[in-house]
Amino acid sequence: MGLPQLWLWLKRLVIFLQVALEVAVGKVLMTLFPGRVKQSILAMGQKTGMARNPRFAPDNWVPTFFSIQYFWFVLKVRWQRLEDRAEFGGLAPNCTVVCLSGQKCNIWDFIQGSRPLVLNFGSCTUPSFLLKFDQFKRLVDDFASTADFLIIYIEEAHATDGWAFKNNVDIRQHRSLQERVRAARLLLARSPQCPVVVDTMQNQSSQLYAALPERLYVIQEGRICYKGKAGPWNYNPEEVRAVLEKLCTPPRHVPQL
């Protein structure tokens, strides 16, 4: 094991201990002060829209916090961020993705000249991803003539055999590429109006873009010109609108005197 790999595992160990401590403290506080902890979680849910999501009552999701499934999911997300290679201003990782037809391609295959390419990472079991899907579709409609869009379906955020929410979409963790493609096809019923591809079963794009559970990027000419903060708390399609308005608006011509 080389020094970089050893350093990575040391970072993972530190994160493991941090998450374990956070979950243990959260569990104790939820036992001692259930009302206060619930209000705190609901306040966080206001930011994602979860607390206003008509599909979910608080009892569908609040009690799942600080469970063993919560621990493993948060740990996975934190560990994945150590693999982040998508830097603002840097070259976008040209990861392999798979079309719903089964054909393999690369993210850069969807770049067309100098047109911005919006990457939308998410899954059907991520409530905020679906709640804000119409916002994303409006982006596609409004900028169809000047930008391109790509949905990359990644591993499930709240699979039924993972950190599950009651009354959520019923999809288990993907055990094969076929299962991932089948889950991604559910998005077609929502008329995404842009290509949908899936991440590989090695979760390459999800790791290199630190995309779990959901995230937005804008690429132009192979470079990252917008890196949205990680969801669900900071997943915001309207930020992408502001970026596209700046990138796609031609400079005003100032007449010479």
Swiss-Prot record:
Its EC number is 1.21.99.3, 1.21.99.4. GO terms for molecular function: selenium binding; thyroxine 5'-deiodinase activity; thyroxine 5-deiodinase activity. Keywords: Cell membrane, Endoplasmic reticulum, Membrane, Oxidoreductase, Selenocysteine, Thyroid hormones biosynthesis, Transmembrane, Transmembrane helix. Residues 34-257 are cytoplasmic. It holds the Pfam family T4_deiodinase. Plays a crucial role in the metabolism of thyroid hormones (TH) and has specific roles in TH activation and inactivation by deiodination. Catalyzes the deiodination of L-thyroxine (T4) to 3,5,3'-triiodothyronine (T3) and 3,3',5'-triiodothyronine (rT3) to 3,3'-diiodothyronine (3,3'-T2) via outer-ring deiodination (ORD). Catalyzes the deiodination of T4 to rT3, 3,5-diiodothyronine (3,5-T2) to 3-monoiodothyronine (3-T1), T3 to 3,3'-T2 and 3,3'-T2 to 3-T1 via inner-ring deiodination (IRD). Catalyzes the deiodiantion of 3',5'-diiodothyronine (3',5'-T2) to 3'-monoiodothyronine (3'-T1) via ORD. This is Type I iodothyronine deiodinase.
